[in-house]
Amino acid sequence: MLISCTLTTETPADFSQFISCRKGQQQVNVVQDWRPLVEKYFKPQDVDRAMRIIFCESSGRSNAVGKNTNGTKDVGLWQFNDETWRWLKPKLKIQDDRFDAETSTAVASWLVYNDGWFHWNSSKHCWGK
């Protein structure tokens, strides 16, 4: 877990790295309530990235719904799209819906460890490096 941006930047001259660190830290702080759940499903080295994705995708709101121009919706903490969820539901034998934070986090970790982080590339400008 990141303790302080001042401990991770080598010199004060590297202000852009400090700003980037602070932005990431603020993103993680907003969604701290979800940390125990994320820690349950993600490897320790992936927890902060997962927390940033939750911030960028839904601002930590498990009831978030994003409507797309093609008529589909992105739903829940991880903003799973209708098409993605339709594909995953039978594959993973999912019983709950995308609004269920535990289910969507478990599915997100399955996707990451079986297929990579690219499923959230549309928001990578927010969470990625």
Q: Residue ranges of each PLM-predicted region?
A:
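Substrate-binding/active-site groove segments that recognize
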Residues: 70-90
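Secondary-structure transition/hinge residues
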Residues: 42, 88-89, 116
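Export/targeting segments at the very N-terminus of extracytoplasmic proteins
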Residues: 1-60
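Secretory-pathway/luminal and periplasmic proteins that interact with or process carbohydrate-rich
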Residues: 58-65, 115-120
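Amphipathic alpha-helical interaction surfaces
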Residues: 56-59, 83-86, 114
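Catalytic cores of secreted/periplasmic lytic hydrolases that degrade extracellular macromolecules
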Residues: 13, 19-20, 25, 114-129
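Stable alpha-helical elements in mature extracytoplasmic
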Residues: 30-34, 38, 46-50, 81-84, ...
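Second-shell loop/turn segments in exported
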Residues: 23-28, 37-41, 63, 67-68, ...
